[in-house]
């Protein structure tokens, strides 16, 4: 089933045009962000707005139909961050330089790992390079996001 235009608009505005996983700005992207099914349709998820999140193409692709990830510290299977039920700043902070997302809870760490939000395993660090440019342009990170203290 396809998400209708009104729902797509609601999801984009509700997210303040940020990827709800990595907080990249849609306006700084070469492609419109995807409407992500938090509980994937393949696992019975619906098109209800409470099951939808705005996701950049990277996060949407890496998340695929996964709902769990591995906490790299404990090796436990942990539910991924749920944008409708959890607050981003409770699970993630930006590094002091604003280039890397740091998971501060098992959920945050498992999500960072599953979605490879800092390109530690893919793309030769291209997202960190992009964030550096966005930082220079004053577009990143979002002002309301917490940052690691020096």
Language-model region placement:
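Extended charged
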Residues: 1-6, 10, 25-28, 50, ...
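Flanking scaffold residues of small Cys/His-coordinated metal-binding clusters
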Residues: 14, 30, 47-51
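Active-site-adjacent scaffolding segments
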Residues: 17-18, 28
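Short beta-strand-alpha-helix junction that forms the catalytic/metal-binding core
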Residues: 19, 43-63
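Right-handed parallel beta-helix
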Residues: 21-23
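Histidine-centered catalytic micro-motifs used for acid/base chemistry in nuclease
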Residues: 34-40, 56
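Short edge-strand/loop segments of extracellular domains
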Residues: 38, 43, 72-74
């Amino acid at each position: 089933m396809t998400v209708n235009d009104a729902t797509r608009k609601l999801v984009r505005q509700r997210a303040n045009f940020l990827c709800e996983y990595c907080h990249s700005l849609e306006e700084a992207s070469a492609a419109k962000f995807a409407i992500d099914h938090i509980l994937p349709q393949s696992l019975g998820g619906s098109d209800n707005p409470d099951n939808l999140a705005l996701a950049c193409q990277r996060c949407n692709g890496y998340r695929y139909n996964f709902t769990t990830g591995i906490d790299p510290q404990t090796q436990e299977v942990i539910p991924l961050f749920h944008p409708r039920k959890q607050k981003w700043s409770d699970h993630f902070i930006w590094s002091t330089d604003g280039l890397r997302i740091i998971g501060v809870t098992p959920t945050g760490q498992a999500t960072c790992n599953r979605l490879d939000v800092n390109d530690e395993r893919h793309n030769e660090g291209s997202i960190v390079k992009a964030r550096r440019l966005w930082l220079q342009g004053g577009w990143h990170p979002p002002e309301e996001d917490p940052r690691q203290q020096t």
